Amino acid sequence: MNFWLQEQAQSNGNRLAIVTNQLSLTYEELYHRAKTIAEYLTSLNQKRIGLYISNDIDSVVLIHACWLAHIEIAMINTRLTRHEMINQMNSVDIATIVHTLPLELEGFNLYHFNDLTQLDKHDVSGYKFNLESIASIMFTSGTTGPQKAVPQTFNNHLASAKGCKQSLGFEQNTVWLSVLPIYHISGLSVILRAVIEGFTVRLVKKFQTDDMLTQIKTYPITHMSLVPQTLKWLMDAGLTQPFSLEKILLGGAKLSPQLIEQALTYRLPVYNSFGMTETCSQFLTASPQMLKERFDTVGKPSENVEVKIKNPNAYGHGELLIKGENVMNGYLYPKYLKDTFDNDGYFQTGDIAEIDDEGYVIIYDRRKDLIISGGENIYPYQIETIAKDFEGIEDAVCVGISDDTWGQVPILYYVTNQDINQTELIEHFENHLARYKIPKKYYQVKSLPYTSTGKLQRKKVKSEDLNEGKNNES
């Protein structure tokens, strides 16, 4: 079969494929550029290369060129240290890295995108497209152990795109505003959905509130992918009506009830979702109607996806397991990980969840973020939600710290520009939580660490000294 991009060039050649503030390409133009670069890439004689790229047109051309040349791509997070990059690339036997951003990294063959045309050309027109071959390799955070390399096949991506279309909905007239980095699955999946369906992606290099608002107001944007914090920034800056937006896909972090209520008040078409690198993006999606019925749900599984709860406790809480064609076959590195799949072939996500009587899935926390205090499970998100409901608290995060008596106890960092009465805050928790769940220490801080795309860096909260403000113990 032909590659998706070639099929779109033949059937929808004049349709816009990629648009930025500087440039735009139709599907025919994108295909011809990618095919030309693919002919140069074959001279590298590499089965697999690393990509150090950005949200720009050259990077999208490069991705498709690699696939046309039958080259697997290992995506490099541009925020990593040199040491982290080297370890990742070595773990999956990468010798060559192609980059669209400035890069100096010892021990690898480096080629800037603009220099590829100095290589010899070889014809790629006879190459056949195999759905079962590896398309991309991404790395999980490695916070609970070794860095994990996730191989994603074209069929995994196709199944994910089909599931997204079924649960969210998109068509050839869709215009998807995408600011999430394409080296992450949330960003790359938009590029793949587009080339499979034939819609237009409006690509944004970096999240800037004013620029995003201008694009939403100016262009016929129908779809947009965000994390909850960036939606909050947009609403605070003036996104108080949907304009042409039909779907706002949220993921990557918990949705607070306050944010949902505000978004629905503005009639914003918010869809909460849940997915992983290992599942090629979302496999659970909650529509606005579902969120009205149950604000804390991530919805129901996509078509052809099965989910279940492993060893549920008395409350129905247990580890979420998933099975489907969107799920990877196993890690490339480390190759032999225990407890990746159960005996029935379900992938074990490491997330604590519940499936209610209506079939809605509720994610409580990552298993690694769970606080176990005196044998009791404490979900940080529950504490954070109640904290944000206290007047004057703008943001909050709960983490566990070691305790000689209980093993772990919860503490709270919160952001406010008001004078918070600590006694009243503790009383607020006492009215809503069992005593063992109430934070034992409180830190008022100026801000919490977020990535440029608005995702809370919980790992930094645990490792860095944020205690720049008031400290009180309960």
Curated annotation (Swiss-Prot):
GO terms for biological process: fatty acid metabolic process; menaquinone biosynthetic process. GO terms for molecular function: ATP binding; medium-chain fatty acid-CoA ligase activity; o-succinylbenzoate-CoA ligase activity. Keywords: ATP-binding, Ligase, Menaquinone biosynthesis, Nucleotide-binding. It catalyses: 2-succinylbenzoate + ATP + CoA = 2-succinylbenzoyl-CoA + AMP + diphosphate. Pathway: Quinol/quinone metabolism; 1,4-dihydroxy-2-naphthoate biosynthesis; 1,4-dihydroxy-2-naphthoate from chorismate: step 5/7; Quinol/quinone metabolism; menaquinone biosynthesis. NCBIfam families: menE. Converts 2-succinylbenzoate (OSB) to 2-succinylbenzoyl-CoA (OSB-CoA). It comes from the Bacteria. Disulfide bonds: none annotated. Its EC number is 6.2.1.26. Pfam families: AMP-binding, AMP-binding_C. Belongs to the ATP-dependent AMP-binding enzyme family. MenE subfamily. This is 2-succinylbenzoate--CoA ligase.
